[in-house]
Regions:
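Membrane-interface extramembranous regions at the lipid-water interface
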Residues: 1-40, 82-98, 116-150
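Hydrophobic alpha-helical transmembrane segments in multi-pass membrane proteins
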Residues: 32-89, 93-118
């Protein structure tokens, strides 16, 4: 039996993005899904980054090279799921994934993107799908006045 998202811990969220939704650019991602993936990558990459820095400071080229190679492999491996979850996070606030390119505007773009990533998503269905926090949402069809479950 698969866990409900309400029971997920950091590792469950990270695995959801890294493996089950590796290149899924459609739909919506909750803040928890995005930020736990970012935190998981940070925890995974930091030891190798430190290894590279220690290697340089001790003039140990082999150690530095090893740290840099592993760091690069991990960073490249998680580039696509990182981009995909960022696009889905933007979808959660009803913005197109193309808004991710705002990060190319020095300083201001990164700040705006960071604010958007911290913003709570739309509470109901938007242009990109149902609210990932409330999958039991009920939608009202004004043309046929009856309540239908999604």
């Amino acid at each position: 039996m698969e866990k409900q998202e309400s029971d997920y811990n950091m590792i469950d969220w990270w695995k959801k993005v890294a493996f089950r939704n590796y290149a899924n650019f459609s739909g919506r991602a909750r803040r928890a899904e995005y930020w736990y993936f970012v935190l998981g990558n940070f925890i995974l990459i930091i030891p190798f980054y430190v290894l590279a820095i220690v290697g340089v400071s001790n003039e140990n080229i082999g150690l530095s090279l090893l740290g840099n190679i592993v760091y690069l492999v991990i960073a490249l491996g998680f580039f696509i799921p990182g981009l995909a979850v960022a696009v889905r996070r933007l979808h959660d606030i009803n913005k197109s994934g193309w808004y991710y390119f705002i990060v190319l505007i020095p300083l201001i773009g990164a700040i705006v993107l960071l604010v958007w990533f911290f913003t709570d998503g739309d509470r109901f269905t938007n242009n990109y799908g149902a609210d990932p926090k409330n999958l039991n949402e009920v939608e009202f069809d004004f043309e046929r006045p009856e309540i239908t479950s999604l």
